[in-house]
Every structure is written in C-alpha cells, then in structure tokens.
C-alpha cells in the first residue's frame, strides 16, 4: 500500500542523515514493534544447545517511554522514524523536546571551504516540527527547545520558529547563533509574551540580541541564565528567582557601560568581561550577594600590546575599580576563581586591602598580579581566614606597592604585611598549587614562596616537566 506523505514535510529520503547502523537498528526495532508479540529463541549461556524462548514485548512499551527515547535522538531523526512503521508514525509528535540543528543539513565540501547548507530542507523541516497549524493549546508543553543556527544557513525569519515554540511553554530554552561575518550585528530574538515563558527555568543565549528585560515580571520562574556574546541593551538583570548567572563576552560595551544586577538568591556567578581603553561592561550590584557560593570572574584586556596602551587610562581605571567594588559584594562565596585581575582590581580602592572573605575555602588566581613582593597575596591570605586550597597559575608580581598619591603607607599596615609569613598569614591553608611555564620570569614567585614556607610543615607532591607545577600540602 502506498503511504501518503505527512503534512510535516518529512524529507524525500527520510533516512538521510541517520548512520546506517542506527538506521538498521531503528528499522528492526520498529518492525518488531509493529508485529504482534512473538517467541524468539535465546541461546543458553551454558552452550547446552537447548534454547529458551522469550517474548519480544517492544510493541507493548507505552508511548511515553518511546517518546523519551526519541527525545534523545533529536527532532530530525525522531521525525524520520515516522516512516518505519505505523507504530512509530505519530510518536514524534508527542516528544517534549524540540531540537533544530542546521549542522545536520550541511552539504559536503572540501576542508577549508565555506559551509553550504540545504536551505529549503532546513525551512521545511523547522516549519514542519513547529507547525503553525497546531493551536497553541493543542500541542504538549515542551521540556526543552534547542536551536543551533548558522548565519549562512538561515535566510528566513527564524524568529517565527522561536515564537511558535514558546507558545508550548518550554522549561528550558537553548538558542545558539553562529555569525560568519566579522561585522554581523546579532539578530533580535523575541522572548514574549510572559505567558509563553511562565515555565521557563533555564535560558541560554549565544550570539543573539534579546529584546526583553530580564526581570521578575517578564520571567517569573527563571533560575539559570547564560548570556554569551550577546548584545543586551537594557542594562538590568533583576530576578528574585535567579540562582545561576553567566555573562560571557558581552559585545555592546561601547554603548552600554553598566550592567546592574539584582539577584538576592544567586548562588553561582560567572563573568567573562573584555575591556579596553574605550569600552567594557561594568557589572554593578547595589546589595551584597549573600547567597552566593561559587563565583568566577575573568577580565580580558583587548588592547594591543603597544607601549602607548600602558599609559594610565581613566576608562580602564574605572573598569578595574568597578571589579574591585564587585568583589566586595561577593564576600559570602566559598569557591572563587579570578583570572586577569591586577592589583587595582583585587584591592579595595580606599583601604588598599583585599575584601574580607570569611567563608572562602578555595581560591584560584590565574594570570593575576599579586603585587610588589606579593603584598596583594599577603592581604588575600590575611582576609581569608578559612582558606584551605590556594592555586596560583601563571601569576606575576610586577610594579610597586600601591598607595594613594600624597599619602604614605601606615606603619600598622606595613608591619602587618611584612612581619607575617605566607604560611602564618592563613593558618587554615592545607594545600598550595603553583603553576607556570618553565623558563618564565614568574619562577621568582616560586622561589620566594618556598623561602617563606617552613619546610617542616609542608611537603612537595609533584613537579611537571613542561610546566613547573608544584603542589604543597601541609603535613
């Protein structure tokens, strides 16, 4: 009997894109599912030759279980199984995960050639999976929407696919857009109305331009927010439900200079912030983040390594001071990773001391400036009384000890920093890991550090060959 093509625009070759082994297995499974339960021989493990028989109950599996299996295949392969048998014909419609990955429609080409895609197939497939003929209330709610788009593969208004998916009230949305041109401006992405995102708990956006404010009224259930290489013009993230936030490489630092954060329930924060003499996004929070447990801050100076760029620049100074102020709001953290921070960013602008971190147990300083005769490191150890693990990766101590113009360092502070050894500054310290490339000037840090540590209290654990990596553990 000739089968009619489904209205969901199944490709002419429905098995295209499925590996032969997977296709064969799926076909066999579907064939068994479409037949009545039957007996099949099972070879006895003892090799006695007398096979036992068991029933094949694949066809008895409930739809919900098969739909969960299809959810792990991705939408394209899930749709392709619909032509295998009647048992599988409409199962994909009930799958609560929609995955649209244009990479599976890429045409073969030589290495190094620009990617080419089957644009018509992409549009037909996406329009079929997210059919406009389905009334918003008729389709099942989604557990997740995942879209991986490419600038060269999307010539149509892909926002309509997002809009249709949002009407199914997904709990997780993952949108990835890969630009191919250097000066491409991120396309806008709609995330409205509120009723469509009322269940949304996890939102990850890459390379797009969200047009809505991330606030409590707009996203009443949002807990996990990841924004990477996006242009976000509103400059405010305010959510009492937010628990995890990642703001990675925002690309609008030339006209949006501040990102205000209000999230009293935040437990995890990750920031990757490029900055230069002309642009950079400063993250500001008015109140301490008292629920924070894990924090990671990376700052990247994007100015060329030209001697002229080493001169004092007020915009850079303001950016680094903002990082220092932010650190002072994160004092409840237990695990802290810092990359690229210099003394201006690490020390408080007024007291010239590291903020007090009473609960900090694990600290990573990566490519940080720990000060003249590591006075910054001393301040860190003195103000982190419960620190247990310290990792110093590719750190350096350059420049002179910081002090305000026209002021001298107080005798109390001088005595405090110079009289204590690194070991006594933090008595709770249990392990120290120092890494840097062999032959780099930062080996002085290792020698100076070892000189101040009582050898009868610490022992070396490992030394790497390519990089000098020494782990010290308290006995």
Swiss-Prot record:
Q: Which GO terms describe its biological process?
A: DNA repair; meiotic cell cycle; protein ubiquitination
**Main localization category:** nucleus
In its UniProt entry, the species of origin is given as: Oryza sativa subsp. japonica
What is the reported phenotype of gene knockout?
Answer: Plants are female fertile, but male sterile as they are not able to produce tetrads and microspores. No differences compared to the wild-type plant during the vegetative stage. Plants develop normal panicles and floral organs, except for smaller and pale-yellow anthers that fail to produce viable pollen grains. No effect on the differentiation or early mitotic division of germ cells. No meiocytes are detected in 4.5 mm and 5.0 mm long flowers, but in 3.0 mm flowers meiosis appears to initiate normally.
Report the GO terms under cellular component. chromosome; nucleus
State which residue ranges cross the membrane. none
List where Low complexity composition bias occurs. Answer: 22-33
- Which pathway does the record list? Protein modification; protein ubiquitination
- Which residue ranges does the record assign to the F-box domain? 55-91
InterPro entries assigned: F-box-like_dom_sf, F-box_AtFBL13-like, F-box_dom, F-box_SCFL_complex_component, LRR_dom_sf
Where in or outside the cell it occurs: the entry states: Nucleus; Chromosome
Q: What is known about the tissue distribution of this protein?
A: Highly expressed in the stem, leaf and in the anther during meiosis. Weakly expressed in roots and lemma/palea.
**This protein's superkingdom?**
Eukaryota
| Family as reported in the entry's similarity comment | Belongs to the F-box protein family. FBX subfamily.
Organism placement in taxonomy? Eukaryota, Viridiplantae, Streptophyta, Embryophyta, Tracheophyta
Q: What protein is this chain from?
A: MEIOTIC F-BOX protein MOF
Question: What does the function comment of this entry state?
Answer: Probable component of a SCF (SKP1-CULLIN-F-box protein) E3 ubiquitin-protein ligase complex and may function through the ubiquitin-mediated protein degradation or signaling pathway. Required for male meiotic prophase I progression. Required for telomere bouquet formation, homologous chromosome pairing and for the formation of the synaptonemal complex (SC), which stabilizes initial chromosomal axial associations and promotes crossover formation.
The annotated subunit structure for this chain is:
Part of a SCF (SKP1-CUL1-F-box protein) E3 ubiquitin-protein ligase complex. Interacts (via F-box domain) directly with SKP1.
Keywords noted in UniProt: Chromosome, DNA damage, DNA repair, Meiosis, Nucleus, Ubl conjugation pathway
Q: Where is this region: Disordered?
A: 1-58
């Amino acid at each position: 009997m000739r089968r009619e093509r489904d209205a969901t625009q199944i490709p002419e070759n429905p098995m295209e894109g499925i590996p032969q082994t997977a296709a064969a297995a799926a076909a066999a499974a579907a064939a068994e599912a479409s037949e009545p339960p039957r007996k099949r021989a099972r070879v006895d493990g003892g090799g006695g030759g007398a096979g036992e028989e068991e029933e094949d109950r694949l066809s008895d599996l409930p739809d919900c279980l098969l739909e969960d299996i299809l959810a792990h295949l991705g939408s394209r392969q899930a749709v392709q199984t619909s032509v295998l048998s009647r048992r599988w014909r409409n199962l994909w419609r009930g799958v609560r995960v929609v995955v649209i990955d244009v990479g599976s429609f890429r045409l073969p080409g030589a290495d190094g050639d620009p990617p080419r895609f089957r644009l018509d197939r992409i549009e037909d497939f996406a329009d079929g999976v997210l059919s406009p003929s389905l009334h918003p209330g008729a389709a099942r709610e989604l557990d997740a929407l995942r879209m991986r788009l490419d600038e060269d593969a999307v010539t149509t208004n892909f926002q309509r696919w997002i809009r249709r998916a949002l009407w199914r009230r997904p709990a997780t949305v993952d949108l990835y857009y890969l630009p191919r041109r250097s000066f491409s401006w991120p396309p806008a992405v709609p995330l409205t109305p509120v009723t469509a995102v009322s269940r949304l708990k996890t939102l990850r956006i890459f390379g797009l331009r969200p047009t809505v404010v991330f606030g409590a009224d707009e996203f009443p259930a949002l807990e996990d927010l990841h924004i990477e290489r996006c242009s976000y013009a509103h400059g405010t993230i305010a959510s009492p439900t937010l628990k995890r936030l990642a703001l990675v490489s925002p690309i609008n630092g030339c006209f949006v200079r501040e990102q205000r954060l209000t999230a009293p329930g935040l437990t995890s924060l990750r920031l990757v912030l490029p900055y230069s003499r002309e642009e950079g996004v400063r993250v500001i929070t008015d109140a301490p983040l008292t629920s924070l447990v894990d924090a990671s801050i990376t700052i990247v100076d994007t100015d060329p390594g030209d001697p002229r760029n080493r001169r004092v620049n007020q915009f850079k100074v303001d950016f680094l001071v903002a990082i220092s102020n932010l650190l002072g709001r994160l004092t409840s953290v237990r695990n802290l990773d810092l990359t690229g921070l210099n003394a201006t960013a690490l020390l408080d602008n007024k007291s010239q001391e590291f903020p007090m971190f009473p609960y900090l147990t694990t600290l990573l300083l990566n490519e940080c400036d720990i000060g003249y005769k590591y006075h910054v490191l001393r301040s860190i150890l003195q103000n982190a009384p419960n620190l247990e693990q310290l990792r110093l990766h590719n750190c350096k101590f350059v420049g002179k000890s910081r002090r305000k113009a026209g002021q001298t360092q107080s005798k109390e502070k001088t005595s405090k920093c110079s009289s204590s050894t690194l070991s006594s500054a933090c008595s709770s310290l249990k392990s120290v890991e120092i890494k840097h490339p062999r032959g780099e000037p930062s080996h002085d840090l290792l020698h100076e550090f070892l000189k101040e540590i009582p050898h009868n209290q610490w022992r070396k654990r490992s030394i790497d060959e390519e990089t000098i990596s020494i782990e010290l553990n308290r006995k």
